[in-house]
């Protein structure tokens, strides 16, 4: 079990589906079905592997729809940010934000927004009802201590390194796309410094960011004339930050549209801050009440919830609690891996919050809520575009982090179909767990709610459970392979549940994660 050295393993309680529940998408009272597990703790790599098998978390509850039985099959969807080009409607939203910030312009007429997974609470309500019925009573501290003792008894050092200093120094990390300068908070839009005018015979006005890059490049050239490129790469700046001069007719990039300079007398100032939500950073704690008030108004106005709901504890349970262990490896993103809130601050107050997970291969969007007074800004679309840009920023240092997961795509649900407009994107095949371009999937979904997207009839799940006896079980304060555990069990339903769990999480996760059994 060397894979646990230096860190804690994932610990989960598995609960197989026993019934159908109300569907939050089509409102069928007994149409939704999913299997779930309560994650006491989970490594970011395990969760990455799980979402690549169709799982998804809500708080600490991780669930996987029974795709061929549930009324609204939910297909994991991911966007490829490195090839992403904003559509006309996306550009319209970004320009609308710029006009509002620059001149305070408010568009006329109503605006239909696209909040990420706006029906998530309803969609998993049945699953949470199941968890409540089971009356889970587990002392997490005791469980953690038991695991630690078990690991130590096997000669493994399970002491977890707490990146306390890094977490404190990175309570919030401002987005600084294309900037190599360390900063804790960076304004989304900066006032341009005085430069050359609009006279066409003179060079165009340059952004301060570009000027800083040029100065840094010249300085490195003086220090190492023969190796300026290597100098930038050594400092973590990939060559992509310094592309060849674009042709005048080349369309603007996503970053150009988001970070377009504002006039000196701009009406509003927008900042985006990324704060770690689990374990909660000091900045997260300091803004928790304000963030909750935004969520409460969002639920009351957008989802018509009564004023006494949701409570702060419900908010914390769904959107702040996370099983993901914070990790800050040297080759990872500066903010580390784990669960975060991406806060949108307008003139010093929070107007929207995107709940995200930063994982080894992707940024995963969990939820978005916003102040209904700013619905006219299409914050659902705007935040998705910002998260795509954020993924591209993280990719510059961590090359394998190159995807943006948008949760589930439900072809039969109009509220969820918009996710397919962020192209290029892929859907996960529910049988072989390979990614298939969405264009190839849509014709099949027009004919049937449930589809196998992989067209190769011989293809199988490459990570299917082939050696269930190697599955790791945590039972009576001891860690053991399932092959040992099953000799102590006489209940056939227990074996069926464990084997089902193994088939759903796959061989790799079954050998790494600890399945908690009473």
From Swiss-Prot:
It is found in: Nucleus; Cytoplasm. Transmembrane segments: none annotated. InterPro entries: Acyl_CoA_acyltransferase, Arg-tRNA-P_Trfase_1_euk, N-end_Aminoacyl_Trfase, N-end_Aminoacyl_Trfase_C, N-end_Aminoacyl_Trfase_N. The keyword Transferase applies. Involved in the post-translational conjugation of arginine to the N-terminal aspartate or glutamate of a protein. This arginylation is required for degradation of the protein via the ubiquitin pathway. Does not arginylate cysteine residues. Monomer. Interacts with LIAT1; LIAT1 is not a substrate of ATE1, the interaction takes place in the cytoplasm and seems to increase ATE1 arginyltransferase activity. This is Arginyl-tRNA--protein transferase 1. It comes from Homo sapiens. The lineage of its organism: Eukaryota, Metazoa, Chordata, Craniata, Vertebrata. The gene is ATE1.
């Amino acid at each position: 079990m060397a894979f646990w050295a230096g860190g804690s393993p994932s610990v989960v309680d598995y609960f197989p589906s026993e019934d159908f529940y109300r569907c939050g998408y089509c409102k069928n009272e007994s149409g939704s079905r999913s299997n779930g597990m309560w994650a006491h703790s989970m490594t970011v790599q395990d969760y990455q592997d799980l979402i690549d098998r169709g799982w998804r978390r809500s708080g600490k509850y991780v669930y996987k729809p029974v795709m061929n039985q549930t009324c609204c099959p939910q297909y994991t969807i991911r966007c490829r940010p490195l090839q992403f080009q904003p559509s006309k409607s996306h550009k319209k939203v970004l320009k609308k934000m710029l006009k509002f910030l620059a001149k305070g312009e408010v568009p006329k007429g109503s605006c239909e927004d696209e909040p990420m997974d706006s029906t998530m609470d309803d969609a998993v309500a049945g699953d949470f009802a199941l968890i409540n019925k089971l009356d889970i009573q587990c002392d997490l501290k005791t469980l953690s201590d038991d695991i630690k003792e078990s690991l130590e008894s096997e000669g493994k050092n399970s002491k977890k390194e707490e990146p306390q200093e890094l977490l404190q120094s990175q309570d919030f990390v401002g987005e600084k796309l294309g900037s190599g300068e360390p900063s804790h908070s960076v304004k989304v839009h900066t006032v341009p410094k005085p430069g050359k005018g609009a006279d066409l015979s003179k060079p165009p006005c340059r952004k301060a960011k570009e000027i800083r890059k040029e100065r840094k490049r010249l300085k490195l050239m003086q220090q190492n004339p023969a190796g300026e490129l290597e100098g930038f790469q050594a400092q973590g700046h990939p060559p992509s930050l310094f592309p060849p001069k674009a042709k005048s007719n080349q369309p603007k990039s996503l970053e150009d549209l988001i970070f377009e300079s504002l006039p000196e007398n701009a009406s509003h100032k927008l900042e985006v801050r990324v704060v770690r939500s689990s374990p909660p950073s000091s900045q997260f704690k300091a803004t928790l009440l304000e963030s909750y008030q935004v969520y409460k108004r969002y639920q009351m106005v957008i989802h018509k919830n009564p004023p006494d709901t949701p409570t702060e504890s419900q908010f914390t349970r769904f959107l702040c609690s996370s099983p993901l262990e914070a990790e800050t490896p040297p080759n990872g993103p500066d903010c580390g891996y784990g669960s975060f809130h991406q806060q949108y601050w307008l003139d010093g107050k929070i107007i929207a919050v995107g709940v995200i997970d930063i994982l080894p291969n992707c940024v995963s969007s969990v939820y978005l809520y916003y102040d209904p007074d700013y619905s006219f800004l299409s914050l659902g679309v705007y935040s998705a575009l910002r998260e795509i840009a954020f993924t591209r920023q993280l990719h510059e240092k961590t090359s394998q982090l190159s995807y943006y997961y948008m949760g589930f795509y439900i072809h039969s649900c109009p509220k969820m179909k918009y996710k397919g407009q962020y192209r290029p994107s892929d859907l996960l095949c529910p049988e072989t767990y390979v990614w298939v371009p969405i264009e190839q999937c849509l014709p099949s979904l027009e004919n049937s709610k449930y589809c196998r997207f992989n067209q190769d009839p011989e293809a199988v799940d490459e990570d299917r459970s082939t050696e269930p006896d190697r599955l790791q079980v945590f039972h009576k304060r001891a860690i053991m392979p399932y092959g040992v555990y099953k000799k102590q069990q006489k209940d056939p339903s227990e074996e069926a549940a464990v084997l089902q769990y193994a088939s759903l999480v796959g061989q790799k996760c079954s050998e790494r994660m600890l399945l908690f059994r009473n």
